Amino acid sequence: MIYQTDNDKLYRYLFKDRAVRGEWVRLNKTFTDTLNSHEYPRIVRNLLGEMMVATNLLTATLKFKGNITIQIQGNGPLKLLLVNGSDSQQIRALARLQDDVYDDMTLSELVGNGILVITIAPTNGERYQGVIALDKPTIAECLEDYFIRSEQLQTQLLIRSGEYEGKPVAAGLLLQIMPDGTGSQEDFEHLATLAATVKDEELFGLTAENLLYRLYHEETVEIYPPSAVEFHCGCSLERSGSALLLISDDEIENILTEHGGSIDMQCECCGTHYFFDKKTIEKLKA
Protein backbone atom coordinates (compact mmCIF):
# COMPACT_ATOMS: atom_id res chain seq x y z
CA MET A 1 0.00 0.00 0.00
CA ILE A 2 1.31 3.46 -0.93
CA TYR A 3 0.79 6.29 1.54
CA GLN A 4 0.80 10.03 1.07
CA THR A 5 4.16 11.78 1.40
CA ASP A 6 4.63 13.04 4.96
CA ASN A 7 2.13 10.62 6.45
CA ASP A 8 3.14 9.14 9.78
CA LYS A 9 5.39 12.11 10.47
CA LEU A 10 5.26 14.91 13.00
CA TYR A 11 6.68 18.33 12.18
CA ARG A 12 7.51 21.14 14.57
CA TYR A 13 7.77 24.69 13.30
CA LEU A 14 8.33 28.18 14.63
CA PHE A 15 7.00 31.57 13.52
CA LYS A 16 10.18 33.57 13.85
CA ASP A 17 8.58 37.01 13.95
CA ARG A 18 5.60 36.04 16.09
CA ALA A 19 6.91 34.06 19.14
CA VAL A 20 4.40 31.32 18.36
CA ARG A 21 5.20 27.64 17.78
CA GLY A 22 3.33 24.99 15.87
CA GLU A 23 3.11 21.26 15.21
CA TRP A 24 1.54 19.18 12.48
CA VAL A 25 1.04 15.44 12.33
CA ARG A 26 -0.68 13.04 9.95
CA LEU A 27 -1.38 9.38 10.65
CA ASN A 28 -2.21 6.85 7.99
CA LYS A 29 -0.33 3.56 8.41
CA THR A 30 -0.11 4.24 12.16
CA PHE A 31 -3.88 4.67 12.28
CA THR A 32 -4.49 1.63 10.05
CA ASP A 33 -2.22 -0.55 12.19
CA THR A 34 -4.14 0.54 15.29
CA LEU A 35 -7.48 -0.38 13.71
CA ASN A 36 -6.39 -3.66 12.11
CA SER A 37 -7.42 -5.96 14.95
CA HIS A 38 -10.66 -4.09 15.73
CA GLU A 39 -14.00 -3.44 14.06
CA TYR A 40 -15.00 -0.21 15.74
CA PRO A 41 -18.07 1.72 14.54
CA ARG A 42 -17.16 4.70 12.37
CA ILE A 43 -17.84 7.32 15.05
CA VAL A 44 -15.59 5.48 17.52
CA ARG A 45 -12.92 4.96 14.87
CA ASN A 46 -12.88 8.68 14.07
CA LEU A 47 -12.77 9.67 17.74
CA LEU A 48 -9.89 7.25 18.25
CA GLY A 49 -8.04 8.94 15.39
CA GLU A 50 -8.62 12.36 16.93
CA MET A 51 -7.31 11.15 20.28
CA MET A 52 -4.22 9.63 18.66
CA VAL A 53 -3.43 12.90 16.88
CA ALA A 54 -3.97 14.85 20.11
CA THR A 55 -1.61 12.50 21.95
CA ASN A 56 1.10 12.86 19.29
CA LEU A 57 0.82 16.64 19.41
CA LEU A 58 0.98 16.71 23.20
CA THR A 59 3.94 14.32 23.49
CA ALA A 60 5.84 16.56 21.07
CA THR A 61 5.62 19.37 23.64
CA LEU A 62 7.41 17.28 26.29
CA LYS A 63 10.82 18.57 27.39
CA PHE A 64 11.82 15.21 28.87
CA LYS A 65 11.75 11.50 28.10
CA GLY A 66 8.49 9.86 29.07
CA ASN A 67 4.97 9.27 27.85
CA ILE A 68 1.48 10.71 27.93
CA THR A 69 -1.74 8.76 28.32
CA ILE A 70 -5.04 10.37 27.37
CA GLN A 71 -8.20 8.49 28.22
CA ILE A 72 -11.93 9.06 28.05
CA GLN A 73 -13.86 7.49 30.90
CA GLY A 74 -17.64 7.59 30.77
CA ASN A 75 -20.92 5.86 31.54
CA GLY A 76 -22.28 6.14 28.00
CA PRO A 77 -22.06 3.62 25.15
CA LEU A 78 -18.32 4.35 24.95
CA LYS A 79 -16.99 3.17 28.30
CA LEU A 80 -13.28 3.78 27.69
CA LEU A 81 -11.00 5.16 25.01
CA LEU A 82 -7.31 5.14 25.81
CA VAL A 83 -4.26 6.35 23.89
CA ASN A 84 -0.67 6.13 25.09
CA GLY A 85 2.18 7.91 23.30
CA SER A 86 5.88 8.29 24.03
CA ASP A 87 8.31 11.17 23.46
CA SER A 88 9.72 9.07 20.59
CA GLN A 89 6.27 9.15 18.91
CA GLN A 90 5.40 5.49 19.44
CA ILE A 91 1.68 5.18 20.04
CA ARG A 92 -0.97 2.59 20.89
CA ALA A 93 -4.71 2.85 21.49
CA LEU A 94 -7.88 0.95 22.33
CA ALA A 95 -11.59 1.51 22.91
CA ARG A 96 -14.20 -0.38 24.94
CA LEU A 97 -17.92 -0.22 24.22
CA GLN A 98 -20.74 -1.22 26.52
CA ASP A 99 -23.76 -0.37 24.35
CA ASP A 100 -24.77 0.34 20.76
CA VAL A 101 -23.45 3.51 19.16
CA TYR A 102 -24.75 5.49 16.20
CA ASP A 103 -22.86 7.68 13.75
CA ASP A 104 -24.99 10.76 14.48
CA MET A 105 -24.20 10.74 18.21
CA THR A 106 -22.60 13.80 19.79
CA LEU A 107 -19.55 13.41 22.01
CA SER A 108 -21.78 13.89 25.04
CA GLU A 109 -24.21 11.19 23.89
CA LEU A 110 -21.36 8.80 23.14
CA VAL A 111 -19.57 9.25 26.46
CA GLY A 112 -22.41 10.13 28.82
CA ASN A 113 -21.23 11.59 32.10
CA GLY A 114 -17.55 11.42 31.22
CA ILE A 115 -14.14 12.88 31.90
CA LEU A 116 -10.88 13.21 30.02
CA VAL A 117 -7.85 12.09 32.05
CA ILE A 118 -4.33 13.13 31.03
CA THR A 119 -1.42 11.33 32.70
CA ILE A 120 2.11 12.62 32.10
CA ALA A 121 4.73 10.08 33.16
CA PRO A 122 8.40 11.13 32.94
CA THR A 123 10.93 8.31 32.70
CA ASN A 124 12.62 9.93 35.69
CA GLY A 125 10.38 11.91 37.99
CA GLU A 126 6.89 12.05 39.41
CA ARG A 127 3.75 11.40 37.39
CA TYR A 128 1.24 14.19 36.90
CA GLN A 129 -2.45 13.66 36.27
CA GLY A 130 -5.04 16.17 35.15
CA VAL A 131 -8.79 15.62 34.87
CA ILE A 132 -10.81 17.57 32.31
CA ALA A 133 -14.57 17.84 32.03
CA LEU A 134 -15.91 16.68 28.66
CA ASP A 135 -18.17 19.71 28.43
CA LYS A 136 -17.20 20.90 24.94
CA PRO A 137 -18.41 19.58 21.56
CA THR A 138 -14.98 18.18 20.58
CA ILE A 139 -11.88 16.68 22.16
CA ALA A 140 -9.79 19.48 20.63
CA GLU A 141 -11.83 22.16 22.41
CA CYS A 142 -11.62 20.31 25.73
CA LEU A 143 -7.81 20.15 25.39
CA GLU A 144 -7.56 23.82 24.46
CA ASP A 145 -9.35 24.60 27.71
CA TYR A 146 -6.93 22.29 29.56
CA PHE A 147 -3.90 24.22 28.28
CA ILE A 148 -5.38 27.56 29.31
CA ARG A 149 -6.27 26.33 32.81
CA SER A 150 -3.22 24.20 33.62
CA GLU A 151 -0.42 25.76 31.59
CA GLN A 152 -1.77 29.30 31.11
CA LEU A 153 -0.82 28.93 27.44
CA GLN A 154 -3.07 30.07 24.63
CA THR A 155 -3.38 27.00 22.39
CA GLN A 156 -5.27 26.11 19.24
CA LEU A 157 -5.90 22.50 18.20
CA LEU A 158 -7.38 21.63 14.82
CA ILE A 159 -7.92 17.87 14.50
CA ARG A 160 -9.65 15.86 11.78
CA SER A 161 -10.22 12.13 11.36
CA GLY A 162 -11.88 10.13 8.61
CA GLU A 163 -10.86 8.69 5.24
CA TYR A 164 -8.78 10.02 2.37
CA GLU A 165 -8.59 8.18 -0.95
CA GLY A 166 -10.25 5.17 0.67
CA LYS A 167 -7.81 4.83 3.58
CA PRO A 168 -8.18 5.76 7.27
CA VAL A 169 -6.42 9.01 8.11
CA ALA A 170 -6.18 11.39 11.05
CA ALA A 171 -4.31 14.69 11.12
CA GLY A 172 -4.03 17.84 13.14
CA LEU A 173 -2.36 21.15 13.88
CA LEU A 174 -1.28 22.61 17.20
CA LEU A 175 -0.59 26.32 17.55
CA GLN A 176 0.73 27.64 20.85
CA ILE A 177 2.03 30.94 22.14
CA MET A 178 5.63 30.60 23.36
CA PRO A 179 5.84 29.82 27.09
CA ASP A 180 8.65 32.33 27.66
CA GLY A 181 6.17 35.20 27.64
CA THR A 182 7.50 36.89 24.49
CA GLY A 183 4.46 36.10 22.35
CA SER A 184 1.51 38.44 22.02
CA GLN A 185 -2.20 37.61 22.05
CA GLU A 186 -2.63 39.60 18.83
CA ASP A 187 0.00 37.51 17.00
CA PHE A 188 -1.52 34.27 18.23
CA GLU A 189 -5.04 35.26 17.19
CA HIS A 190 -3.80 36.31 13.74
CA LEU A 191 -2.14 32.93 13.14
CA ALA A 192 -5.07 31.02 14.66
CA THR A 193 -7.47 32.77 12.27
CA LEU A 194 -5.33 31.67 9.33
CA ALA A 195 -5.10 28.09 10.64
CA ALA A 196 -8.88 27.89 11.03
CA THR A 197 -9.26 28.17 7.24
CA VAL A 198 -7.66 24.75 6.71
CA LYS A 199 -9.79 22.17 4.90
CA ASP A 200 -9.93 18.45 5.61
CA GLU A 201 -8.49 17.54 2.22
CA GLU A 202 -5.54 19.87 2.85
CA LEU A 203 -4.77 18.29 6.22
CA PHE A 204 -5.14 14.82 4.70
CA GLY A 205 -3.42 15.34 1.34
CA LEU A 206 -0.81 18.12 1.32
CA THR A 207 2.80 17.78 2.38
CA ALA A 208 3.79 19.70 5.50
CA GLU A 209 5.67 22.30 3.47
CA ASN A 210 2.77 22.86 1.07
CA LEU A 211 0.23 23.00 3.88
CA LEU A 212 2.19 25.60 5.82
CA TYR A 213 2.72 27.65 2.66
CA ARG A 214 -1.00 27.50 1.94
CA LEU A 215 -1.83 28.78 5.43
CA TYR A 216 1.10 31.08 6.18
CA HIS A 217 2.75 32.16 2.91
CA GLU A 218 3.20 35.71 4.22
CA GLU A 219 4.88 34.52 7.45
CA THR A 220 8.48 33.51 8.18
CA VAL A 221 8.18 29.88 9.25
CA GLU A 222 11.14 27.73 10.30
CA ILE A 223 10.34 24.03 9.86
CA TYR A 224 12.36 21.49 11.84
CA PRO A 225 13.20 17.95 10.66
CA PRO A 226 10.26 15.57 11.16
CA SER A 227 9.87 12.77 13.68
CA ALA A 228 8.54 9.42 12.47
CA VAL A 229 5.33 8.21 14.13
CA GLU A 230 4.51 4.53 14.46
CA PHE A 231 2.10 2.15 16.13
CA HIS A 232 3.92 0.21 18.84
CA CYS A 233 2.04 -1.99 21.26
CA GLY A 234 4.85 -3.26 23.47
CA CYS A 235 2.96 -6.36 24.57
CA SER A 236 4.80 -9.63 25.24
CA LEU A 237 4.26 -13.13 26.55
CA GLU A 238 5.65 -12.06 29.91
CA ARG A 239 3.47 -8.97 30.21
CA SER A 240 0.33 -10.78 29.15
CA GLY A 241 1.09 -13.63 31.51
CA SER A 242 1.66 -11.37 34.51
CA ALA A 243 -2.08 -11.43 35.24
CA LEU A 244 -1.93 -15.20 35.58
CA LEU A 245 0.68 -14.89 38.31
CA LEU A 246 -1.93 -13.22 40.51
CA ILE A 247 -4.15 -16.30 40.37
CA SER A 248 -3.74 -19.25 42.72
CA ASP A 249 -2.35 -22.53 41.41
CA ASP A 250 -5.69 -24.28 41.98
CA GLU A 251 -7.56 -21.67 39.95
CA ILE A 252 -5.03 -21.92 37.12
CA GLU A 253 -5.42 -25.70 37.10
CA ASN A 254 -9.20 -25.31 36.83
CA ILE A 255 -8.91 -22.79 33.99
CA LEU A 256 -6.46 -25.02 32.11
CA THR A 257 -8.82 -27.98 32.49
CA GLU A 258 -11.80 -25.94 31.26
CA HIS A 259 -9.86 -24.70 28.20
CA GLY A 260 -8.29 -27.96 27.10
CA GLY A 261 -4.89 -27.39 28.68
CA SER A 262 -4.17 -23.97 27.15
CA ILE A 263 -5.22 -20.45 28.11
CA ASP A 264 -5.63 -17.95 25.27
CA MET A 265 -4.99 -14.32 26.21
CA GLN A 266 -5.44 -11.66 23.54
CA CYS A 267 -3.83 -8.20 23.67
CA GLU A 268 -6.50 -5.50 23.52
CA CYS A 269 -4.29 -3.10 21.57
CA CYS A 270 -2.83 -5.18 18.76
CA GLY A 271 -4.90 -8.37 18.90
CA THR A 272 -1.91 -10.72 19.35
CA HIS A 273 -2.84 -14.03 20.96
CA TYR A 274 -0.64 -15.50 23.68
CA PHE A 275 -1.15 -19.13 24.66
CA PHE A 276 -0.22 -20.44 28.08
CA ASP A 277 0.00 -24.13 28.92
CA LYS A 278 1.18 -25.54 32.23
CA LYS A 279 4.87 -25.48 31.25
CA THR A 280 4.72 -21.86 30.06
CA ILE A 281 3.07 -20.74 33.29
CA GLU A 282 5.66 -22.60 35.37
CA LYS A 283 8.44 -20.78 33.48
CA LEU A 284 6.78 -17.43 34.22
CA LYS A 285 6.68 -18.28 37.91
CA ALA A 286 10.31 -19.41 38.03
Curated annotation (Swiss-Prot):
Its primary localisation, in coarse terms, equals cytoplasm
Cellular component (GO) terms are: cytoplasm
Keywords associated with the record: Chaperone, Cytoplasm, Disulfide bond, Redox-active center, Stress response, Zinc
Regarding how it is modified after translation, the entry says: Under oxidizing conditions two disulfide bonds are formed involving the reactive cysteines. Under reducing conditions zinc is bound to the reactive cysteines and the protein is inactive.
Any GO BP: protein refolding
Where does this protein reside within or beyond the cell?
Cytoplasm
GO molecular function annotations of the record:
protein folding chaperone; unfolded protein binding
Q: Which cysteines are joined by disulfide bonds?
A: 233-235, 267-270
Q: Where is the signal peptide?
A: none
Q: Which Pfam families does the annotation name?
A: HSP33
Xref: InterPro entries? Heat_shock_Hsp33, Heat_shock_Hsp33_C, Heat_shock_Hsp33_N, Hsp33_helix_hairpin_bin_dom_sf
List the PANTHER family.
Answer: 33 KDA CHAPERONIN
Q: Which family does the record assign?
A: Belongs to the HSP33 family.
- Cited HAMAP family: HslO
Its biological function? Redox regulated molecular chaperone. Protects both thermally unfolding and oxidatively damaged proteins from irreversible aggregation. Plays an important role in the bacterial defense system toward oxidative stress.
The record's section on NCBIfam families has: PRK00114.1
Return the protein name.
33 kDa chaperonin
> What is the organism of origin for this protein?
Histophilus somni (strain 129Pt)
Gene name in the database record: hslO
